[in-house]
C-alpha cells in the first residue's frame, strides 16, 4: 500500500504511537497528527478491519481477505478470539460459544483454550493471544503504510469489565505482534476522550458511555471538567453484543428451514451455517434502517434454496431479553456513582450495535425522553480516544492534549482469602487507579510457620464464588501464638489495571510478592518468545507468498499479452507464419504448465518468464523495428532497437511487466528491469 500524502507527524519518528481498538468482530486504528486523530483505512479502503484470520493450503489471510473467503473455508477461519482470550476452556461462556463456531477449540495445558486449524496441509494449534496478535499486526501494518514509518508503540483498548487475566492476555498479544504496549485502557473511557476532547471549558458534565459492540458491553459514568476525565463507576458484560443477536436470528432461520423442509437440519453443516450467518448479520444491519429485511440464499442445504422475510418487530422479539439486559449495568453505574438519572448530562452511544433502533428507544425511555448524543462515530470513537491517549503517553505537546488527565477505575474488587473462605477486600471496585492499599493480617494457628496468600477478584462474600488471580507463600514466620505475628499485605494496581501483591512479616522484615499474572491462565515468557518468533516466521511466509503470486501474475500477464498481440490482424501481417507459430507454441506450452502448477515457486515462474521472453521478445520487437525505421529511429538513441523496456505497452492490449528487451539486448532480461510498463488504452 502506498503511504498517504501529507505532512509528517509532529512527533520524533521513534515516538509515534498509535491507538488500537481490538474488537471482537472489527478492529480500528488511529494516530494523532496535526492536532487531530486520523482514523487509518486498510488496504481495502475500509476504516474498520474484520478481526478474522484464515488459514489455507497456501497462505494466511487477515482482515477483509479472511472474512471474504469464510464460506469456502469455515473450519479454518478464526474469529471471536476476544471471546476466548484470558478465559478457561471449561468456562460456560466458552462452551456456549463453541456451539456457534465452525472452527475447533480444544483444551490445552491448565485449561487454556487452543484453536485448531489446518494450515499448509498440517494441523496447527494456536492460543487466542496469537490470533489476536495477528489482527494487531495487521493494524500495525496499516498504520505503517499510512505513515510511511516503522511503529513500535501502541495503546490498546479492552472492555472495562475485562478481568486481570484478560488484560494480561491482551498485553501479551500486543507483545507477540511486535508492539510495545504503552497502556491498556478501557474502551468506554477511550470513547469519552473522543467525545470530550474538544469540549473544554464548559463546566462539569456527567457523561454516561453506553458501549455495545460485536461481543462485549460496557457502561461507564464519567465526570468531565477542563480536560480531566474522571471515571466514577463502570459495569458491563464481557459476553454480550451483536454476535448474540446474530445467533438468535440464525437459530430462528434454522428452525424456519426445518419447518419448511420436512425437518431437514442444517445446523451440523458448517458451510451452510456460515452462509446463513453472513446473511443474518446483513439482515440485522438492514433492520436498523428498514422495517423489514429479506434473507435469500441459493442452494443453502442439500440443494434447497431458502428465503425468509424478517420484520424489525420479529427481530426485536427474538432479542428483547438481551436488549432489556443492557439497562441493568446502566442502573448499576448510577447506583455505584450515587447519582440519579437527572444528573446525567449526556448519554453517548458507542459500538455498532447501538444503531439498533430498539436499543436507542429503551435508553431514551430509561432517561425520561433524553435523546442520546450522536456526535461521535460509534465504530471509530474507541480507536480515536486510544490514539489521543497514545499521543499523551508519548509526550506530544499539542495544546489539545497537553492538559488532558485520565482517571480510570478498576472494574472489580480485589482482595484475599481469610479464615473460612471469606473474601476480604483491599481495593473496592470503582477505585481510581493507579491505587495502593495495605492491611495487616495475622496467623490462624499457634506457631504457624507460614501463610498462603490467595488473591481474588470479584464481588461475592466467599472466595469460592470469585475469580482466583494467583497465590504465593510467605514462609519463615517465627514461632508465636496465633494472632501475634503481623503480616502486612499490600495491593498495588497500576494504570493498566494489573495488580502487584506484596506480603511482609513485620518482625523479621521477610517478604514475598507476586505480580498477578494469573499463572494458570497466562502465557509464560518462553511461550511469548516462541510466539514472537512464530509471528515473524508467518510474516516472512506471507511476504514470500505475495512475491510468488506477483511472479505468477507477471508470467500470466506476459503470456496473455503476447497471445493477444499475435491474434491482432495488423501484427500478424508484419510477422512470418513460422515466427507466429514459434511464439504461439511457446506461449501455449507455458500457459498449460501454469494451469498445472498453480503452487510453483517464485523462481520457477521467473525462469518460465525468461524462457518466454527469450523466444518471443526478439520476434515481437520486429514489429516495432519496422515502425521505428519508418519514424526515423526509436527514442533513446537506439535506431531499430528497444531501450531496455517498452515505456508504453504494445498494441492489442499487451502489458509487459518489467519491460521487454529489444532486438539488440539479451533475450533474458529479468522481470522488473527497465521502466514500468503501462497499458495503452
Curated annotation (Swiss-Prot):
Q: Where is this region: Disordered?
A: 655-681
UniProt keyword list: ATP-binding, Nucleotide-binding, Stress response
User: What Pfam family is a match for this entry?
Assistant: HSP70
Coiled-coil ranges from the UniProt annotation: none
* Residue ranges, compositional bias (Gly residues): 655-665
- Specify whether ATP-binding is a keyword of the entry: yes
Top-level taxon: Eukaryota
Any one GO MF annotation of this record? ATP binding
Q: Where is the composition biased (Low complexity)?
A: 666-675
Instruction: Name the family.
Output: Belongs to the heat shock protein 70 family.
Q: Per its record, how is this protein called by name?
A: Heat shock 70 kDa protein
- What organism does the UniProt record list as the source? Plasmodium falciparum
